[in-house]
Amino acid sequence: MLLLQKEHIIQIATMQKNDAVVIIPTYNEKENIEAILRAVTGLEEHGFDVLVIDDGSPDGTAAIVKQLMAGDLKDRVHLVERQGKLGLGTAYIAGFKWALEHDYEYVFEMDADFSHDPKDLPRLYNACAVEGYDLAIGSRYISGVNVVNWPMGRVLMSYFASKYVRCVTGIPVNDTTAGFKCYKRRVLEAIDFDKIRFKGYAFQIELKFTAYKLGFRIKEVPVIFVNRQLGVSKMSGGIFGEALFGVMRLRWAALTGQIKPKQA
């Protein structure tokens, strides 16, 4: 299939059924969850499934997901419920293991609050499925600064945090803290999740750095990040602190040869 856009012909892959799954961690996302699930599963040219990892949301997020699973989103949406807030990193690791067990070839990370535009999912998929990259990153900083409705202080903190990570680790990625990604199956199969150190913001850095050190090909795909309109942000100062000091540990791990492929 060919798509004509901005005077360039772009090849778009046609996915096989059950080829890709989008992992969406949730905690108190009742305002967003139905809309985001319908937006992802409603992409006409691509059959993305969705896995929601809910950390015991007291607002009833999981109940909404179950209602949709019992209705018209049956077989497209899946749910893993956990007891309490166990951290973003452990949520994604649980999702990765589930995706591998269910034989998906492409596995995505995505926020529930529309900060990541579902319409960009095919572009990330295309980078891996057609162009041959192993990890595609929805990047806010590959072509300038593409962030909407963030306070300037937060924009600067995020931007320079990514620069700091790149400087310390040497990873050739502009948006090192991005949370909108597509992994090929083989990347996740090569990572030893038992040795992943971080649970919060630094988890996003660690997964990219690990993939890079294991020799996988990475592409940044420019996206526009839009701050959430509904619900409450889960970011905190502690999360940034983990990222700040965590990159030094990652650098040391690389220097001492601790980052190795998972043993079969």
Regions found by a protein language model. Name each.
Residues 2-18, 170, 194-264:
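Hydrophobic helical membrane-anchoring modules
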Residues 29-42:
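Short, well-formed alpha-helical segments that are part of the catalytic scaffolds
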Residues 47-57, 80-81, 110:
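Short beta-strand/loop segment that forms part of the nucleotide-sugar
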